[in-house]
Amino acid sequence: MEGAAWNTRAVRLTNDQCWGHLAAVDHGVLCTGGPRGAIDAVPVCFVVVGKVIASPIDTVKAKETTELGRLKNLEADATATLLCEQWVRFDWSRLWWVRAQLVRRSGHDLTVTLREECEDALRHKYFQYRGVEFADLLLFNVKSVTGWAESDDPDALRRAMSGEGAATRY
């Protein structure tokens, strides 16, 4: 495009920055492979415990059943992708995204301690889960993380993660 100025500040995030964003963000979109090759994407709550990502199947939010499509998909194919992002319409210097490639941990790969740590972390992060039992808990090993940010300015990244100066008009 004639006259277009390309942004030379945009950067690929380091592994540590990706993990920092994953730990701080409040939700993401979990993508699993559905029937006939379709991708099923669903917003999820999650926590990072060490290098494990945990997402609950709860009974807090209204749903017809706890036998969700993502569970069926993960039984057929244990791989998934978690996408987290921040979009600030009026301040593009704060745009970022992180993608984690995941593999579901199987039942024999779970320890009681890890499950309890993840449940405690979920209850600490999301007050709605305090005093509530989970129907199930999806635990994932992270194969890789990658991410992008509009700016490599550490202050812009800090502001983006803290929500500082967020636009309030729409």
Regions found by a protein language model. Give the residues of each.
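Short, solvent-exposed loop/turn elements at beta->coil junctions and helix N-caps
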Residues: 31-35, 85-90
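Short glycine/serine/proline-enriched coil/turn segments at secondary-structure junctions
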Residues: 36-38, 63, 90-92
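A generic structural signal for short beta-strands and their flanking turns/coil linkers
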Residues: 26-28, 42, 49-53, 76-80, ...
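An N-terminal domain-cap segment
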Residues: 2-48
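A short mixed-secondary-structure module that forms the rim of ligand-binding clefts
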Residues: 47-88
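Charged, gly/pro-rich active-site loop segments
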Residues: 1-13, 87-170
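Amphipathic alpha-helical interface surfaces
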Residues: 18, 66-70, 114-118
